[in-house]
């Protein structure tokens, strides 16, 4: 109302109101709400505890005091007596319980214990991680039925002496060569230092008369021709690589010898490759 009157301009005197009281002999129709008395009012004894009057006598009369030092124990004084300062003595070692005593003498032993616990934990975590990784890797390996199909059994009595027979193994050509005595002596007499990929003949065979190779040229993956080439072994028609009867590179662009797969003689005339 006052703000409206202040902004009304020339109508402000009309909008303002004045109240006056005139004394008279007539008695009031209503009694006074608070009778006049000379006795002091009685305060309610059940007043709220958390009020300004109740807290004024319990508040701290002095500021909070804290004492901290290098050779003295830390202490804090509060206004309330029911507050318990946390005590971590049960978690501390006996050598460092006394704050007024130097703990330098026991520092090496405490460090050694910490290092021992850390190293033990690290080894345990590494072992657990190794097992987890091993199980994960083994889950991606081939199953037993797939591994069974990856092996091939060859009857050696079907291959005459001096001949080479090709088989299909894991989608690749597999050469099994029955060498003659002349071929065995010839390949054993080759000087290893003259070879591009130095390897003695006895390192590539388990039985001198049998040579088992993967028929894939190590240059660009072509299939060599058996009993051909300048050295009577294998010849790659793609780029002219020559291999001897032991599958070693002797001439041409191929950088390595023919690969020797994993095989095992189960009997005198049966070999299992894979």
Curated annotation (Swiss-Prot):
Its EC number is 7.1.1.8. PROSITE patterns: RIESKE. It is a single-pass membrane protein. Disulfide bonds join 222-238. Residues 187-272 form the Rieske domain. Binds 1 [2Fe-2S] cluster per subunit. Fe-S cluster delivery to the Rieske protein is mediated by components of the iron sulfur (Fe-S) cluster assembly machinery that reside in the mitochondrial matrix (including HSC20 and LYRM7). One of its GO terms (biological process) is respiratory electron transport chain. Its cofactor is [2Fe-2S] cluster. Gene3D superfamilies: Cytochrome Bc1 Complex, Chain I, Rieske [2Fe-2S] iron-sulphur domain, Ubiquinol cytochrome reductase, transmembrane domain. Residues 79-103 are mitochondrial matrix. Proteolytic processing is necessary for the correct insertion of UQCRFS1 in the complex III dimer. Several fragments are generated during UQCRFS1 insertion, most probably due to the endogenous matrix-processing peptidase (MPP) activity of the 2 core protein subunits UQCRC1/QCR1 and UQCRC2/QCR2, which are homologous to the 2 mitochondrial-processing peptidase (MPP) subunits beta-MPP and alpha-MPP respectively. The action of the protease is also necessary for the clearance of the UQCRFS1 fragments. GO terms for cellular component: mitochondrial inner membrane; mitochondrial membrane; mitochondrion; respiratory chain complex III. GO terms for molecular function: 2 iron, 2 sulfur cluster binding; metal ion binding; oxidoreductase activity; protein-containing complex binding; ubiquinol-cytochrome-c reductase activity. It is found in: Mitochondrion inner membrane. Keywords: 2Fe-2S, Disulfide bond, Electron transport, Iron, Iron-sulfur, Membrane, Metal-binding, Mitochondrion, Mitochondrion inner membrane, Respiratory chain, Transit peptide, Translocase, Transmembrane, Transmembrane helix, Transport. SUPFAM superfamilies: ISP domain (SSF50022), ISP transmembrane anchor (SSF81502), Non-globular alpha+beta subunits of globular proteins (SSF56568). Residues 141-274 are mitochondrial intermembrane. The chain crosses the membrane at residues 104-140. Belongs to the Rieske iron-sulfur protein family. NCBIfam families: Rieske_proteo. The Rieske protein is a high potential 2Fe-2S protein. This is Cytochrome b-c1 complex subunit Rieske, mitochondrial. The gene is Uqcrfs1.
